[in-house]
């Protein structure tokens, strides 16, 4: 049957007599058991392909530096290493530094030269406080980015602190954070650890931390896998040391060194202090809030069961789909292999006509609030009654800061029960919270970068920018603009920044696609300079493969050259938005540094 089908396919669909200068034999896979293939599969995490290399001798050979790894615990030797590190760091040369810690400092890896690579564990006279003091000595003399390391925010707390304000006595000029530097060069990469740095900048394949230590904690590795821990500490410090100059040169050649020097490196210390300070939480208020949510969820559950005529798992899309589209006979049910879609956008269209759907949406929102915030935040409250979250510099491709453990940037504000969660965050006694933000920063950046005179004039005259846009787009006097016209103009203003299509705008405003298309066309007719500017952003990105902010932050956009329409369209939207959103991120970071 398959043979017949194949013959029919060739006969009906495939033209076999096209003259092509290509030998089918050339398409055969040759011997791919070589170092280049191994590095490629490792780079893209092709786990199944990597397994094929396990019984070959291709797997990364030990770099030459391995023979120079040396564990030292003799006090005099350790002193000599730190004294030499101070001599180097106080000049113009660099050292590599890797901090090995879990909750407590366990060891350090220090690279002084290609042949001087040391592992210094906490042992005997070499106590944790001694190591911290000697590291502080080394850092105190460095002022020319002499210490190459990575993720330095994670261990700034070990250095000597100011006795008055508790800030680390560390010059931000002491370090070059190779992870942040590599992030600026390749913001879409998944990792910036020493293994990635070695592959990217040294063309060397190092064993990863996971390959060396598996799932062992640092404390367990000290006792159970010391040889591999030595490798990890020495390899990482060596990689930082070897990469530092190459990364610096590349940043300068790409005109990004100023961004690194004046924004990203100083910001490390701002974020560190934010993490150290944390934010105070009224734990009892959080518990009470959880109870209120729990009660509301139970009431909604009962009402949903009554409307459905039976009890079922509301959290199961499959069961919910059957109830809504089969039992209750609601329209527009789209059935897939796994059942009916019950995504938010599907339910939101049904909600105006079916009260039970509104209750289901509210049930979902309240359940999310309870699990993620009311109950979820409790586990992050430290002994001091504060949440000390993590702020990340190398996660987003846009340059924005992200927040994890927990995500404090995503606390909901649109629904009343969501707003209530913010009340559990309280200032210290005698203090108040101050909320400061830029007004319409992205629209102002658009006006500045495009040079559009009408938009600039509207801002300079302190006009209501959305009302001014409505007057331009709808051709009416400013004082005759209706609230609906202003609302539509606001959606267009922000939609333009995010590269919104006519379809997206029509969904946003609940209007026809034709009307949305007309709005966008009127907008560009009113602001032709913006149209030229945005088209230029897209064409530049197509030519270069990336976009740039005003501060030369780069966003790689491989999708913009895709043959796939959807991917290419996504790339074009990114090209329109990334320079504006990225510039806004840079300006906010500068403001944080100035306030700090």
Predicted feature residues:
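Short active-site oxyanion
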Residues: 141-147, 310, 430-433
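Short, contiguous acidic/charged loop-to-helix segments that flank catalytic cores in large enzymes
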Residues: 124-126, 378-379, 409, 455-457, ...
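Conserved "right-hand" nucleotidyltransferase catalytic core of DNA-directed polymerases
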Residues: 1-2, 6-7, 12-125, 165-167, ...
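Charged catalytic and DNA/RNA-contacting regions of genome-maintenance
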Residues: 109-114, 130-249
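Conserved catalytic core of nucleic-acid polymerases
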Residues: 219-222, 276, 332, 384, ...
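Function-dense linear segments that define catalytic or interfacial modules
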Residues: 110-114, 188, 192-215, 232-234, ...
């Amino acid at each position: 049957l398959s043979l017949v089908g194949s013959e029919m396919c060739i006969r009906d669909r495939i033209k076999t007599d096209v003259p092509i200068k290509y030998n089918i034999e050339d398409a055969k896979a040759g011997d791919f058991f070589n170092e280049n293939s191994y590095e490629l599969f490792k780079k893209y995490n092709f786990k199944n392909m990597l397994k094929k290399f396990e019984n070959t001798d291709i797997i990364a050979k030990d770099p030459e530096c391995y023979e120079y790894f040396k564990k030292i615990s003799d006090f005099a030797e350790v002193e000599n290493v730190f004294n030499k590190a101070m001599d180097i760091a106080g000049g113009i040369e660099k050292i590599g530094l890797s901090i090995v810690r879990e909750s407590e400092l366990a060891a350090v890896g220090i690279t002084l030269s290609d042949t001087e690579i040391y592992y210094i564990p906490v042992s005997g006279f070499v106590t944790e406080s001694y190591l911290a003091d000697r590291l502080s000595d080394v850092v105190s003399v460095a002022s020319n980015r002499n210490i190459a390391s990575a993720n330095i925010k994670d261990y700034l707390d070990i250095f000597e602190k100011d006795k008055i304000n508790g800030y680390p006595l560390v010059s931000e000029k002491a370090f070059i954070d190779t992870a942040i530097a590599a992030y600026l060069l390749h913001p879409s990469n998944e990792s910036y650890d020493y293994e990635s740095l070695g592959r990217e900048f040294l063309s060397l394949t190092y064993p990863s931390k996971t390959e060396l230590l598996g799932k062992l904690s640092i404390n367990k590795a000290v006792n159970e896998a010391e040889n591999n821990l030595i490798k990890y500490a020495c390899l990482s410090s060596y990689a930082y040391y070897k990469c530092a100059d190459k990364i610096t040169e590349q940043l300068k050649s790409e005109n990004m060194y100023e961004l690194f020097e004046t924004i990203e490196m100083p910001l490390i210390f701002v974020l560190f202090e934010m993490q150290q300070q944390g934010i105070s939480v009224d734990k009892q208020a959080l518990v009470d809030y959880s109870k209120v949510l729990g009660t509301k969820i139970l009431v909604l559950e009962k009402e949903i069961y009554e409307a459905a005529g039976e009890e079922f798992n509301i959290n199961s899309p499959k069961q919910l789909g059957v109830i809504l589209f089969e039992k209750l006979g609601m329209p527009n049910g789209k059935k897939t292999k796994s059942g009916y879609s019950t995504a938010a956008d599907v339910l939101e269209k049904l909600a105006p006509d079916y009260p039970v759907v509104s209750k289901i949406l509210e049930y979902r929102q309240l359940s999310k609030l309870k699990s993620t915030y009311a109950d979820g935040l409790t586990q992050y409250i430290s002994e001091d009654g504060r949440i000390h979250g993590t702020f990340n510099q190398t996660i987003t491709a846009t340059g924005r800061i992200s927040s994890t453990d927990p995500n404090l940037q995503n606390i909901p504000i649109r629904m009343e029960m969501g707003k209530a969660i913010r009340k559990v965050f309280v200032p210290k006694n005698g203090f108040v919270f101050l909320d400061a933000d830029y007004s319409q920063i992205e629209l102002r950046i658009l006006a500045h970068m495009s040079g559009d005179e009408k938009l600039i004039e509207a801002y300079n005259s302190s006009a209501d920018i959305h009302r001014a846009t409505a007057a331009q787009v709808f051709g009416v006097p400013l004082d005759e603009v209706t609230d609906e016209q202003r609302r539509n103009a606001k959606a267009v203003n922000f939609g333009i920044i995010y590269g919104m299509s006519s379809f997206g705008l029509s969904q946003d405003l609940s209007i026809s696609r034709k009307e949305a298309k007309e709005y966008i066309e009127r907008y560009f007719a009113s602001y032709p300079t913006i149209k030229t500017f945005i088209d230029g952003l897209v064409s530049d990105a197509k030519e270069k493969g990336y976009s740039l902010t005003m501060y030369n932050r780069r966003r790689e956009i491989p999708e913009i050259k895709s043959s796939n329409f959807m991917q290419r369209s996504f790339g074009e939207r990114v090209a329109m938005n990334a320079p504006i959103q990225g510039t806004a991120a840079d300006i906010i970071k500068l403001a944080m540094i100035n306030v700090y």
